[in-house]
């Protein structure tokens, strides 16, 4: 059981731990709104100058610096722009200007030095400033502020790790710490959220619940950053398997950021890493519910008290709860319903007439402008291959609702339901990868209308029954565990080994892994990507693509062992369609010199397209084929096996033709690589050999099951048996020489990663352990053998 728990920890890491992108295709976005410029004298519009990275505004601090703090309405935080877009001065309501100083200041309160900070002054900045549209849109569209008197590093920049109290310095263009927007204090909070006070008494109704006592937008980040990190570390994901959302739990502005698994830019082509043709997984957009109740604010007397937000894994329900100073209790509930194929938000209060909001939509990394009519909002558009459509409908009970060009306003309601739908015209089986484009808008509209015609109670009951038909198939409980600490507190205390609390976190990991599997892998025949189906990042790391060198496979390790076989099918059908029905993967095999079979490379999009990054990783076909066989082993579905067997056989033919006979009489995979380090190309790499061994073994076993239905020629069968019998299994040991430190004693036996190169050719402490496929998932070595006993040393040697 402990080993299976680790699989779910791995799944969680695979879905939600990002890596910094080295390149990502940019998407065009509409220009940000231009602020007002005044020529001279009094008057004009005063703005908060808000940095999108940390949602803080330029403020005059006590140490005579311009620093970033939450907007509080102070006159020193409100700036007008005097001059023109190419040459202007900042002046606040106190008459102070902003100048570039040569007197260094701390980057943040107590942080490292900033050599050229912005400071307040009674005099103007020589040369002034200019505004230019920010090319970086990772956190949304905005402006860059350029100091006209500087060159090179001349763009105003949030200095240091984003937080509270950052000073302002300078950097080069196209950095996410540069991007600002100009917002009016009477229409924008100028802070991440209202003041909240967490509940001290809350305990979740269901034990398997992730819960927190502050909004995701204001939570302390483990990474030290802001922006996307709030999403990655604290937003709560919901999903129907294909369409999903992330919940931030804001009181002032409740953001429901949504995604759809097939919203990809790019084409079926092969392109350079991050090239436009390859595309990326796009951020679909967000719904914003701005609080208009007047009950809450930034001060203690107007704080939202008893604050809790949670994700109940037992019911797949998100929830936010808090109380006003007047004692009114507010509850917001969220589901992503697979039966209805929509995301639904439900707003209630303990007293009638207390719900007042303005609802708006915004596109994410795509270019689209929403329109509003009759309590609904929608936007649509087309990328290189696919078209998309999103629609929301606001359904109030009581109060008044008005709709204008800017959004939907509800005042004094007793209850509000918001229904959100979205989709694309993607079809995995069409040669164009699209179908029914002209009907897309009507399909989404009908879907939203059908859900909106039902009550929250009906939608919720359908959703829970559907979800629990999968989730309740498996139960894992650790004795003595109680969920009495916030989830972030469980994480903080885990390394100190606090008994039942540590076990509680492990139990949550297990449940969360299964929850994510159900929530990200139903519907369309396309697998979960590097982030499952969730992404709020415009310049997303590694394009949030389908990585074939462990990531997508790891997503599906829990599917069969924990009775979620149906969740495996989107990946399995993707493999089958690409291998047998679509041409791209056969083209990539030919590109690698093979006339038979199919393969893909390290980085893949949903159209069969690949990037040029590590395109010698052709062993992906063997690994994919093991998943086809695993599903049969758990289901014993012979008709399924008969359908997918041609893809298994074709992958075997690729390797039957490709293997090279070595001088030791064994067959080796040529020019292989052990992800993601060591020699770029070597024959007989353990990772590839172990994979081909499993592929051949499974293919022969499938032939035994199918008999004549396998339709294998006598020549191919004889060749397969010959190659299998003479295959180098990739199982050998070497002695550790002490080159990578003292984690294990010199002379300890470790598994060989390369047949001809020592372990020292690899990277010290590298994260991949690709030569341990023989242990898991393939079980090719047995306890009590020299090979099995070499595994602990191999793990320790890798750090």
Put a short name on every predicted segment:
Residues 1-4:
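Positively charged n-region of N-terminal signal peptides that target proteins for export
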Residues 19-23:
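Sec/Tat signal peptide C-region and signal peptidase I cleavage site
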Residues 193-613, 630-632, 649-652, 662-667, ...:
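Aromatic-residue-lined binding/catalytic grooves and analogous aromatic/hydrophobic interfacial grooves
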Residues 8-16:
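Bacterial N-terminal signal peptides
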Residues 25-193:
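Lectin-like carbohydrate-binding module/patch detector with strong preference for beta-trefoil
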Residues 551, 617-631, 640-657:
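Extended, hydrophobic alpha-helical segments in both membrane/secreted and soluble proteins
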Residues 673-684:
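Short beta-alpha connecting loops at secondary-structure transitions
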């Amino acid at each position: 059981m402990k080993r299976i728990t680790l699989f779910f920890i791995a799944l969680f890491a695979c879905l939600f731990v990002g890596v910094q992108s080295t390149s990502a295709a940019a998407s065009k976005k509409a220009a940000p709104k231009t602020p007002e410029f005044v020529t001279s004298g009094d008057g004009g519009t005063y703005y908060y100058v808000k940095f999108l990275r940390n949602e803080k505004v330029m403020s005059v601090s006590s140490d005579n610096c311009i620093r970033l703090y939450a907007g509080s309405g102070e006159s020193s935080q409100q700036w007008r722009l005097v001059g023109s877009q190419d040459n202007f001065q900042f002046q606040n309501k106190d008459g102070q200007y902003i100048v570039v100083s040569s007197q260094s200041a701390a980057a943040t309160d107590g942080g490292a030095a900033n050599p050229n900070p912005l400071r307040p002054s009674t005099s103007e900045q020589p040369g002034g400033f200019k505004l230019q549209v920010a090319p970086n849109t990772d956190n949304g569209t905005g402006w860059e502020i350029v100091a006209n008197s500087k060159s090179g590093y001349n763009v105003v920049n949030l200095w240091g790790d984003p937080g509270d109290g950052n000073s302002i310095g300078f950097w080069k263009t196209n950095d996410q710490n540069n991007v600002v927007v100009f917002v009016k204090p009477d229409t924008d909070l100028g802070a991440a959220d209202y003041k909240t006070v967490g509940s001290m008494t809350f305990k979740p109704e269901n034990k398997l619940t992730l819960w927190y006592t502050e909004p995701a937008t204001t939570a302390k980040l483990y990474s030290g950053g802001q922006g996307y990190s709030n999403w990655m570390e604290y937003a709560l994901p919901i999903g129907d398997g294909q369409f999903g959302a992330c919940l931030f739990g804001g009181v002032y502005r409740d953001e429901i950021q949504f995604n759809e698994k097939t919203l990809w830019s790019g084409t079926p082509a092969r392109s350079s890493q991050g090239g436009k043709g390859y595309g990326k997984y796009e951020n679909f957009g967000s719904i914003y519910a701005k609080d208009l109740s007047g009950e809450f604010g930034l001060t203690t007397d107007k704080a939202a008290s008893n604050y809790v937000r949670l994700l109940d894994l037992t019911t797949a329900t998100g929830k936010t709860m808090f109380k006003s100073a007047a004692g009114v209790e507010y509850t917001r509930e969220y589901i992503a319903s697979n039966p209805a194929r929509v995301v639904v938000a439900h707003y209630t209060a303990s007293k009638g007439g207390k719900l007042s909001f303005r609802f708006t939509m915004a596109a994410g990394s795509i270019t689209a402008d929403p329109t509003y009519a009759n309590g609904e909002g929608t936007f649509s558009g087309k990328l290189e291959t696919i078209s998309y459509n999103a629609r929301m409908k606001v359904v109030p009970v009581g109060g008044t609702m008005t709709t204008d060009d800017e959004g939907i306003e509800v005042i004094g309601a007793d209850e509000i339901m918001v229904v959100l739908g979205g989709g694309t015209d993607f079809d995995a089986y069409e040669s164009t990868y699209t179908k029914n484009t002209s009907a897309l808008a009507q399909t989404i509209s009908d879907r939203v209308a059908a859900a909106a015609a039902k009550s929250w109670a009906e939608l919720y009951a359908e959703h829970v029954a559907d979800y629990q038909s999968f989730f309740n198939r498996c139960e894992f409980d650790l004795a003595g565990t109680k969920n009495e600490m916030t989830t972030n507190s469980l994480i903080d205390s885990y390394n100190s080994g606090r008994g039942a609390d540590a076990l509680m976190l492990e139990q949550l990991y297990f449940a969360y892994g299964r929850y994510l599997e159900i929530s990200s892998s139903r519907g369309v025949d396309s697998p979960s990507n590097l982030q499952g189906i969730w992404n709020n990042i415009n310049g997303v790391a590694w394009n949030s693509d389908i990585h074939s060198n462990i990531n997508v496979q790891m997503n599906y390790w829990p599917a069969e062992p924990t009775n979620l076989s149906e969740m495996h099918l989107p990946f399995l059908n993707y493999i089958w369609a690409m291998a047998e029905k679509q041409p791209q993967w056969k083209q990539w095999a030919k590109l690698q010199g093979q006339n038979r079979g199919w393969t893909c490379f390290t980085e893949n999009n949903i159209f069969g397209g690949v990037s040029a990054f590590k395109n010698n990783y052709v062993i992906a076909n063997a690994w994919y084929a093991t998943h086809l066989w695993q599903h049969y082993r758990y289901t014993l579905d012979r008709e399924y096996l008969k359908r997918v067997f041609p893809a298994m056989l074709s992958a075997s033919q690729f390797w039957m033709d490709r293997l090279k006979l070595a001088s030791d009489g064994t067959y080796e995979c040529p020019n292989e690589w052990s992800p993601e380090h060591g020699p770029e190309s070597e024959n007989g790499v353990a990772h590839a050999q172990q994979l081909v061994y499993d592929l051949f073994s499974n293919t022969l076993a499938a032939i035994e099951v199918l008999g004549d239905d396998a339709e294998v020629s006598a020549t191919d069968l004889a060749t397969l048996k010959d190659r299998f019998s003479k295959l180098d299994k990739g199982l050998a040991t070497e002695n550790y020489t002490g080159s990578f430190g003292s984690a294990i004693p010199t002379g300890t036996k470790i598994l060989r990663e390369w047949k001809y190169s020592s372990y020292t050719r690899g990277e010290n402490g590298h994260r991949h352990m690709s030569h341990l496929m023989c242990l898991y998932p393939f079980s090719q070595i047995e306890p009590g053998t020299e090979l099995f006993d070499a595994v602990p040393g191999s793990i320790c040697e890798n750090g």
